[in-house]
Amino acid sequence: MFEVLVYMFENYFESDIHPDHETLSKELFAAGFDQEDINGAFDWYSALESMSEESDAQLGTAGIRIYSEAETKRLSADSLSFMMFLEQAKVLTPAQRELVIDRAMALSQPEVGLEETRWIVLMALWNQDKANDYLFVEDAMFNDNRPTLH
């Protein structure tokens, strides 16, 4: 499913091409993706869109996020560090962080690594029209140097 999401983002959403659901489904199937993964990606992205609209509510910024056991098992240490880096850099708000965590946990794979987390952050910020933040994340995604946390 994750590969379908990345393909959709790179080929359609990033370029503001938004074919209807049926056309996109046919194109993804023709590109070699499994129908179950296509449907899962559509559901995942629909949830991202609806949650993005709701995530405007501000969470307190002074708190510390304690991750559940399920989250620490699924999300790699690099993923958690990357989200902390983005939050400390004021790229992600606490509400956006929660959105990213939710969407990461909704993936069908057993572990979510740094690459997947970067893509989820990218999609979430892009979906919320955070162009400048998006550019920062895109640079972080394709720059092999990891951010230094102090």
UniProtKB/Swiss-Prot annotation:
It holds the Pfam family DUF494. It comes from the Bacteria. InterPro entries: Smg (IPR007456). Belongs to the Smg family. This is Protein Smg homolog. It comes from Methylobacillus flagellatus (strain ATCC 51484 / DSM 6875 / VKM B-1610 / KT). The lineage of its organism: Bacteria, Pseudomonadati, Pseudomonadota, Betaproteobacteria, Nitrosomonadales. The gene is smg.
